[in-house]
C-alpha cells in the first residue's frame, strides 16, 4: 500500500504510525470500549466481552511499532452517555495500561461524552473540531465540521466512518472487509464555511481509518444506497482509493 511520507498503516492492523517530528505516534480510530454493554442495552444482543483482547492488542501495537504516543481518533468509548458500569471499568483498565507505557491523546468523538472529563488527568484531549499534531498531521473524528486549520496539514487522519467494502466472488459469494480510504481533500467541501482559501493549490491527503473494533459495523463504501456518516466526506473525498488491512489496493473506492 502506498504510504504518505508521514502516515503509514500497520500491515494487517486497523492502525497507522505517524511521524510527528519529535514523536512517533500510533493512531487508531473507533475503539468503542464497552460495545458489548451497549449492544446488550440497545439491541438485546448478548456477546462475550472482548475488553481484555482490545486492551492487549493496543498495548502490543504500541510496543511493536515503538510508538511514543497513542492517538485515538475519537469514539474511545461506545455508549453516547457518560461511561459507567462495565464500560467505565474497561476504559479505566485500558487507559491505565496504555498510559503506563506512553502518553495518550483522545480526539473527541460523538461517543465520547463525559470521557474527557472523567479521565482529564490521564488523557491529552483535542476537541471535536480537530487539531494539528507535530505541525503536519491533522486529526479529527469526523462527526462534525473540522476546523479549517486542518487544511494547513500535510495529511488529515479521521475516524467515525468505519469504512468497509463488500467483495463478491465469481459464484456470487460475498464478504465484508474493513478498509482504508485515501485521497486528496477538496478544500471547498471540507469545511463548513467554504470561503477559506488555505491550501487550495496543495490540499492535504485525507486518510479515513477503519474501525479498530471489528464489532462496530460500518459504511459499505462501494454499495449503492450507502451514504457517508460524516457531513463533509462525500464532497471532501470525491475520489480516492480503498485498501484492505493487508495493504491490497482495490482502486477507486466507489467502483470496487
What are these regions (language model features)?
Residues 95-100, 149-152, 201:
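Short, conserved loop/helix-junction motifs that constitute active-site signature segments
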Residues 2-26:
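N-terminal basic/disordered segments at the start of proteins
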Residues 24-32, 136-143, 156-158, 206-210:
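Active-site-proximal beta-strand elements of phosphoester/diester hydrolases
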Residues 26-31, 35-133:
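Core catalytic region of metal-dependent phosphoesterases/phosphodiesterases
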Residues 119-192:
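A contiguous pocket-lining binding segment that forms or flanks enzyme active sites
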Residues 20, 65-66, 150-152:
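Glycine-rich phosphate-binding loop signature in dinucleotide/nucleotide-binding domains
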Residues 34-36, 78-80, 110-117, 145-148, ...:
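Active-site environment of divalent metal-dependent phosphoester hydrolases
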Residues 168-256:
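Acidic, His/Gly-rich catalytic cores of divalent-metal-dependent hydrolytic chemistry
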Amino acid at each position: 500500500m502506498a504510504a504518505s511520507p508521514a502516515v503509514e498503516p500497520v500491515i494487517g492492523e486497523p492502525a497507522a504510525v505517524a511521524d510527528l517530528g519529535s514523536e512517533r505516534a500510533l493512531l487508531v480510530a473507533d475503539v468503542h470500549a464497552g460495545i458489548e454493554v451497549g449492544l446488550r442495552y440497545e439491541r438485546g444482543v448478548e456477546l462475550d466481552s472482548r475488553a481484555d483482547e482490545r486492551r492487549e492488542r493496543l498495548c502490543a501495537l504500541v510496543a511493536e511499532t515503538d510508538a511514543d504516543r497513542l492517538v485515538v481518533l475519537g469514539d474511545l468509548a461506545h455508549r453516547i452517555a457518560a461511561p459507567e458500569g462495565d464500560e467505565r471499568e474497561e476504559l479505566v483498565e485500558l487507559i491505565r495500561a496504555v498510559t503506563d507505557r506512553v502518553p495518550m491523546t483522545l480526539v473527541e468523538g460523538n461517543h465520547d461524552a463525559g470521557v474527557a472529563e472523567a479521565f482529564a488527568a490521564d488523557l491529552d484531549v483535542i476537541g471535536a473540531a480537530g487539531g494539528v499534531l507535530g505541525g503536519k498531521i491533522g486529526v479529527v473524528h469526523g462527526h462534525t465540521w473540522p476546523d479549517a486549520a486542518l487544511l494547513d496539514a500535510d495529511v488529515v487522519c479521521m475516524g467515525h466512518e468505519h469504512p468497509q467494502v463488500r467483495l463478491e466472488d465469481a459464484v456470487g459469494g460475498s464478504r465484508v472487509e474493513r478498509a482504508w480510504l485515501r485521497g486528496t481533500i477538496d478544500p471547498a467541501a471540507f469545511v463548513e464555511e467554504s470561503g477559506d482559501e488555505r491550501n487550495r493549490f496543495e490540499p492535504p491527503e485525507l486518510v479515513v481509518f477503519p474501525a479498530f473494533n471489528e464489532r462496530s459495523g460500518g459504511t459499505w463504501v462501494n454499495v449503492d444506497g450507502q451514504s457517508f456518516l460524516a457531513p463533509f466526506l462525500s464532497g471532501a473525498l470525491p475520489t480516492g482509493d480503498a485498501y484492505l488491512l493487508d495493504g491490497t489496493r482495490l482502486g477507486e473506492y466507489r467502483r470496487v
